[in-house]
From Swiss-Prot:
Chloroplast is among the record's keywords: no
Location in the cell: Secreted; Target cell membrane
Organism annotation: Actinia equina (Beadlet anemone)
Transmembrane segments: none
Stretch forming the signal peptide: 1-11
Domain of life where this protein originates: Eukaryota
Propeptide: 46-71
UniProt keyword Disulfide bond, yes or no: yes
Record keywords: Antibiotic, Antimicrobial, Disulfide bond, Immunity, Innate immunity, Membrane, Secreted, Signal, Target cell membrane, Target membrane
Protein name: Equinin B
Organism lineage: Eukaryota, Metazoa, Cnidaria, Anthozoa, Hexacorallia
Role noted for this protein: Antimicrobial peptide with inhibitory activity against both Gram-positive and Gram-negative bacteria (E.coli (MIC=0.25 ug/ml), M.lysodeikticus (MIC=0.25 ug/ml), and V.alginolyticus (MIC=0.25 ug/ml)). Does not show hemolytic activity.
Modification note: Contains 4 disulfide bonds.
Length: 71
């Protein structure tokens, strides 16, 4: 699974938080988890959420990670 690596301490915290969050949200769906983690990182690191979702245009769930539903 490709996870965005960030060298800052903040990035490590985001990675742990997002991996835990997305594993709970998408326990059986690797694609869901991957999208969730990518979005979660964007929010966590303060990037524009729209840019995090550009490669997922077919995915209608462009919402805050804590509202992300498992499908």
């Amino acid at each position: 699974m490709a996870v965005i690596m960030v060298d800052q301490a903040e990035g490590g915290q985001c990675q742990r938080k997002c991996l835990g969050h997305c594993s709970k949200k998408c326990p059986k769906h690797p694609q869901c988890r991957k999208r969730c983690i990518r979005r979660c990182f964007g929010y966590c690191l303060g990037d524009e959420p729209q840019q995090m979702a550009l490669d997922d245009e077919s995915d209608p769930l462009v919402i805050l990670p804590n509202n992300y539903n498992d499908y």
